[in-house]
From Swiss-Prot:
Intramembrane glycolipid transporter that operates in the biosynthetic pathway of dolichol-linked oligosaccharides, the glycan precursors employed in protein asparagine (N)-glycosylation. The sequential addition of sugars to dolichol pyrophosphate produces dolichol-linked oligosaccharides containing fourteen sugars, including two GlcNAcs, nine mannoses and three glucoses. Once assembled, the oligosaccharide is transferred from the lipid to nascent proteins by oligosaccharyltransferases. Belongs to the RFT1 family. Keywords: Endoplasmic reticulum, Membrane, Sugar transport, Transmembrane, Transmembrane helix, Transport. The gene is RFT1. It is found in: Endoplasmic reticulum membrane. One of its GO terms (biological process) is dolichol-linked oligosaccharide biosynthetic process. Its main location: endoplasmic reticulum. The chain crosses the membrane at residues 16-36, 40-60, 95-115, 123-143, 168-185, 204-224, 343-363, 391-411, 421-441, 448-468, 489-509, 510-530. This is Man(5)GlcNAc(2)-PP-dolichol translocation protein RFT1. Pathway: Protein modification; protein glycosylation. It is a multi-pass membrane protein.
Length: 551
């Protein structure tokens, strides 16, 4: 597969992932807004806690494998004239590595659930069906890990379309089961003689509905991927869905289960992800330690709304970029290097322009939009000020995502290890900064956001330095700083629009002010599109050519 073909598939894949995320968020939003009429806040709290357990087990079981298997290229130890054998060997390597999450996840899930079960408030433990709910959660985790070999195979073939479809179907199944159980109980549609109307029974049913929804999600996902396997792989029997010894093409007497280079990479990535997870979840630990319950609610609100743009836009782009670079730069020829740099530069420019729009129009419009979305009860000064500061944080989040995605895709084991040590230092810096800003300077939620900005800045500097060094060492003719002249020219127009925005509107408090600010945003967007019209025309032409080729 050529570099252009890989780029076309990953670009289309990013679109599929965004559409899948959008569908999932809409369905989940509708479900939550329906169920909130029937459930108490503490039930949402315990389900969020169970969700955290599921996410933690799955993250530590499979995330490092998903990143490591992206580096499995066809035929690393094969001759060039044995394409079919080479493909089969690579597929079995993928399957073997995808069995590791199950070996990690079974003991990890049992240990974590057993530990947390004893720490859960006794009230929840005595609720009806609670033990069955926990068991259903555990079975759902195991089913997701059983599905991992099929997921990794689709990832190997850049099959984003299937993934987006299957995850959307699974999310729908989750929501339908969850809603059906709660609604059936509330309307007394089933087993009315067995159920009672007590609040405890209602809460037990709600937790059971959540657990059965998770189980339905995992089972549906597994069935979809297995159907894909039956349709596309089983008849050819190129590999087995179990741990198998693989013969080395260099020496047929030698066999292995796991390729040594990928295994070493997995170990170092796993070590790094532990610190990355600490930084990702660290803000929750900090705010629970230093902030009041009201402040925790404010930050939870900001995180939930702020994560929408992260999950809908940034996350699909980062995942597609990781896979693109891992495949594209498995062979560092000049053509692939130039293509990878071009993709990175275009993405960086896109994020720069997006950051301009967010930084100029986010702080003065966000508080008005937030009040419009969730009502006036959140209209305290602390909330309105915090959402403005959070808008400044979003660009740092975006750049860190793509730069660390690049590093994760091309870094050697030793470079990943050094990055892990750097992440450890960032963790300590984050803790110290949070204490200073929250406790000493009394900045509350704003202090936590500022600490996150400093943390992201350090990580961006490290990753960007790695990228510049990477291309310099490979003696590429172009510079990573190329083609940013249009952005520099746009900065002048952006500064003028920003001044007009603050002079004419300031902090938006009415619909007329919002329309004026939106008009200025459209003017700046038009300037950006005009300045970058050559790049946009090139992308459109390439997309049309790819579509004609696929017809």
């Amino acid at each position: 597969m050529s570099g252009a073909d890989i780029l076309e598939k990953t670009t289309r894949g990013a679109t599929f992932l965004m559409m899948g995320q959008l569908f999932s968020k809409i369905v989940t939003f509708l479900l939550n807004n329906t169920l909130v009429r029937y459930l108490s806040p503490r039930i949402f709290g315990i389900t969020a806690f169970l969700e955290f357990i599921v996410g933690t087990v799955l993250f530590f079981s499979r995330e490092a494998i998903r990143l490591s298997t992206q580096r499995i290229a066809d035929g690393n130890d094969a001759d060039n004239d044995h394409d079919h054998d080479r493909d089969d060997s690579a597929l079995q390597v993928c399957v073997n590595f995808a069995m590791i999450p199950l070996f990690i996840g079974i003991p990890l899930s049992i240990g974590l659930i057993a530990w947390q079960y004893h720490n859960i408030n006794g009230y929840f433990v005595t609720l009806p069906f609670f033990q069955w709910s926990v068991f259903a959660i555990w079975v759902g985790i195991i089913l997701e890990l059983v599905n991992e070999p099929l997921f990794v195979l689709n990832q190997h073939f850049l099959n984003y379309g299937a993934r987006s479809r299957y995850e959307s179907i699974a999310v729908t199944a989750n929501c339908l089961v969850n809603f059906t159980v709660v609604y059936s109980y509330e309307k007394k549609l089933i087993l009315t003689s067995y159920f009672d109307d007590s609040e405890r029974f209602r809460e037990g049913i709600a937790i059971l509905a959540f657990a059965l929804g998770k189980l339905a999600y995992a089972a549906t996902l597994l069935m979809c991927y297995y159907y894909n396997y039956l349709m596309n792989f089983k008849s050819n029997k190129p590999f087995k869905l179990s741990l198998q010894k693989i013969k080395s093409k260099v020496n047929e007497k030698q066999t292995y289960y796991f390729r040594s280079d990928i295994l070493e990479h997995f170990k170092k990535v796993y070590f790094q992800l532990c610190f990355k997870h600490l930084l990702t979840e660290g803000d929750k630990l900090i705010i629970n330690t230093f902030c009041t319950v009201e402040e925790q609610g404010i930050y939870s609100l900001l995180s939930n709304y702020g994560s929408l743009i992260t999950r809908l836009l940034f996350a699909p782009i980062e995942e597609s970029l990781r896979l693109l670079l891992a495949v594209l730069l498995s062979k560092k020829d000049s053509k692939n290097l130039q293509l990878s740099m071009k993709v990175l530069v275009n993405l960086t420019k896109f994020y720069l322009y997006l950051s301009l729009l967010v930084m100029i129009f986010g702080p003065n419009n966000s508080s008005y939009l937030l009040q419009f979305l969730i009502g006036s009860k959140w209209s305290t000064n602390s909330v309105l000020h915090a959402i403005r500061v959070y808008c400044v944080y979003i660009p740092f989040l975006s750049f860190n995502g793509i730069f660390e995605a690049f590093l994760a895709s091309v870094a050697t084991g030793d470079q990943i290890l050094r990055h892990s040590y750097f992440m450890m230092m960032c963790s300590f810096a984050f803790l110290i900064n949070s204490w200073i800003f929250i406790e000493y300077l009394d900045l509350s939620v704003n202090g936590l956001i500022i600490s996150n900005i400093i943390n992201m800045s350090l990580r961006i500097i490290y990753s960007f330095s790695f990228i510049v060094k990477f291309y310099r060492e490979l003696h590429t003719e172009s510079s990573i700083f190329m083609n940013f002249t249009n952005f520099k020219a746009t900065l002048g127009a952006a500064a003028l629009v920003a001044i007009l925005n603050w002079q004419m509107v300031g902090y938006v408090s009415s619909f007329n002010g919002f329309i004026t600010s939106a008009t200025l945003a459209l003017i700046l967007l038009s300037v950006i599109l005009i300045k970058e019209r050559a790049t946009l025309n090139e992308l459109i032409i390439n997309r049309r050519a790819a579509n004609m080729k696929s017809v």
